Structures are given as structure tokens and as C-alpha cells.
Amino acid sequence: MRFLLLLTVALLLTCIMETDAEAKPEDLAERFRERSDCSGMSDGTSCGDTGVCQNGLCMGAGS
């Protein structure tokens, strides 16, 4: 009985870890889009959460 319980918990943890690992690349891609979305804006313009446009890139966004 304990073996089945441990096996079930292990499988659930594995599924949760895989789901979390799959979500991270999307988060990074979204963060990159935020950082690079300064096309047409002049340098010094605010962008993202706390970023500033420099040479067409949003520097410091999300930090």
C-alpha cells in the first residue's frame, strides 16, 4: 500500500516538473519580445515594466 502511494506521488511530481519545464521557454520568449519591442521609439523612452529604449532594444525590462 505504501509503495503505491509513493509511486503515485512520484508520478505526480514528475508531471508537475515536466509542465513547469515546458512553460519556462515560453516565459523567456515573452520576456525577449518585451525587451526587443522598441521599434520606432526614440532612445530614453520608457518600455516594459522598468526598461528604457536604447538603440531599438528595451534595456532593463522586467527587472
Swiss-Prot record:
Residues 22-34 form a propeptide. Residues 1-21 form the signal peptide. The lineage of its organism: Eukaryota, Metazoa, Spiralia, Lophotrochozoa, Mollusca. The cysteine framework is XIV (C-C-C-C). One of its GO terms (cellular component) is extracellular region. One of its GO terms (molecular function) is toxin activity. Keywords: Disulfide bond, Neurotoxin, Secreted, Signal, Toxin. Contains 2 disulfide bond. Its main location: secreted. It is found in: Secreted. Expressed by the venom duct. The keyword Ligase does not apply. This is Conotoxin Cl14.11.
